[in-house]
Amino acid sequence: MVQYELWAALPGASGVALACCFVAAAVALRWSGRRTARGAVVRARQRQRAGLENMDRAAQRFRLQNPDLDSEALLALPLPQLVQKLHSRELAPEAVLFTYVGKAWEVNKGTNCVTSYLADCETQLSQAPRQGLLYGVPVSLKECFTYKGQDSTLGLSLNEGVPAECDSVVVHVLKLQGAVPFVHTNVPQSMFSYDCSNPLFGQTVNPWKSSKSPGGSSGGEGALIGSGGSPLGLGTDIGGSIRFPSSFCGICGLKPTGNRLSKSGLKGCVYGQEAVRLSVGPMARDVESLALCLRALLCEDMFRLDPTVPPLPFREEVYTSSQPLRVGYYETDNYTMPSPAMRRAVLETKQSLEAAGHTLVPFLPSNIPHALETLSTGGLFSDGGHTFLQNFKGDFVDPCLGDLVSILKLPQWLKGLLAFLVKPLLPRLSAFLSNMKSRSAGKLWELQHEIEVYRKTVIAQWRALDLDVVLTPMLAPALDLNAPGRATGAVSYTMLYNCLDFPAGVVPVTTVTAEDEAQMEHYRGYFGDIWDKMLQKGMKKSVGLPVAVQCVALPWQEELCLRFMREVERLMTPEKQSS
């Protein structure tokens, strides 16, 4: 009102001058507000460069001192064999660490996956307990795992320059088991994306093809492990954040039941949200490495350091069983149309399992749209996104989050109005908008009760068919960079099992063929909406990229899930078994 009156009082050139002043003032305010964020970007990238230089120097120094070491042979060793050679002293832990430090430095040049070098790994070697199950094993960490003296930024400027006071529990347990954490890896800003880019460290790219996303939010882990720069990593998963990068980068990953592994000490941007459970899980080149990691973490040390974790040690007899399995399966969830390669991967895996003596039974959890649109979205954004948005004050918003942040910033009434207006043409977007509104405590309790009822319903369906495990499609191949943020509906295959809190893992089983690529030209999706169109566009030019399937078990049955994953791996990629 004041601006309008001033404008009316000043004719001609004076009015134009005043308008220019207003614009200049707005720009100046915006520039001033972003000063802190710009400084954080500069400091973060300086720290990243310094860490990478230290990695290069350490690796080169070791190579000069040990010119006869066969680095390629060491890097090719599967993790179980690597551990065996470390325990037998056939390999020195220094040789393993600095070989992987050098490899991580090398692959980072093409992927931008490493954010920090955990330089005390060099002194950690002398402290690593020789009897530990992971003695001498270099381990990479998603940046959200706090590490004493290191920032865990999540790509947000407010977290830059705030080093952790202590290690998170799982990092502490890794060290007690002899492992040597050596790098932090990149994440999408806030970790609420299945792409991998942020203003502090930039875009991480897929090691198979640089125009493709590595997935997210554990995308740095996927890129590093997928390119051979780490034998084992830890990620987190609240909507597919371990499984997307594992699928896109051609590695294995496990999302356990939410509370099977400790989350104490993890850095996050929203605390207290319990409707959809976050999980901590391992990522590696093969299933046996995942099992080894879980075996090491499920120990008395973790149960002592975090008494809220159920004291359930790894059940070896379940993992090593060879009894035939009764496997439920579905080719599609009827929400996200599978790509031709996804459907083929499930059918070929089904045929191989049947040929090996397992029983395959059609199965599809009920009411998947409700689980995704109402239960999951409503649970994640039950405060209307208010807490989430607090992290972005004065900060840049990465393009991978642009649409989400813009929607969450809308007033409650406008979200409702838009949901009503777009419903005839975009029913999925309408449903997501409706459930991104804030709700009262009473309504939140109702939602959480609905989730419990839904979980019991699916378990009853599962048990009615006497299933051991379930085989499902996994989103693949990798999407183009920046496409995940505009293909939100494609989280359906993974998000369902966060809502249900079932353990789920992914195993690569094939690659995209020229025939798959040709068939993708006819892909329209089930709704033909903007998400389906982006998915079709984002999956083009993918011949040769990895394709995975998802393996699911009931809550607390991680060992059975891993056993099923190992069987799929044995049948579909026998070269891993022979190595």
Curated annotation (Swiss-Prot):
Per the record, residues carrying Phosphoserine are S241
Topology term for the membrane: Single-pass membrane protein
Q: What class of enzyme is it?
A: hydrolase
Instruction: Kindly list the places in or outside the cell where this protein is found, as annotated in its UniProt entry.
Output: Endomembrane system; Cytoplasm, Cytoskeleton
Q: In which tissues is it expressed?
A: Highly expressed in the brain, small intestine, pancreas, skeletal muscle and testis. Also expressed in the kidney, liver, lung, placenta and prostate.
Origin: domain of life: Eukaryota
GO cellular component terms listed in the entry, alphabetical order: cytoskeleton; endoplasmic reticulum membrane; glutamatergic synapse; organelle membrane; postsynapse; presynapse
Q: According to the UniProt entry, how is activity regulated?
A: Inhibited by O-aryl carbamates and alpha-keto heterocycles. Inhibited by trifluoromethyl ketone.
- Similarity comment: Belongs to the amidase family.
Q: What is this protein called?
A: Fatty-acid amide hydrolase 1
Q: Which species does the entry assign this protein to?
A: Homo sapiens (Human)
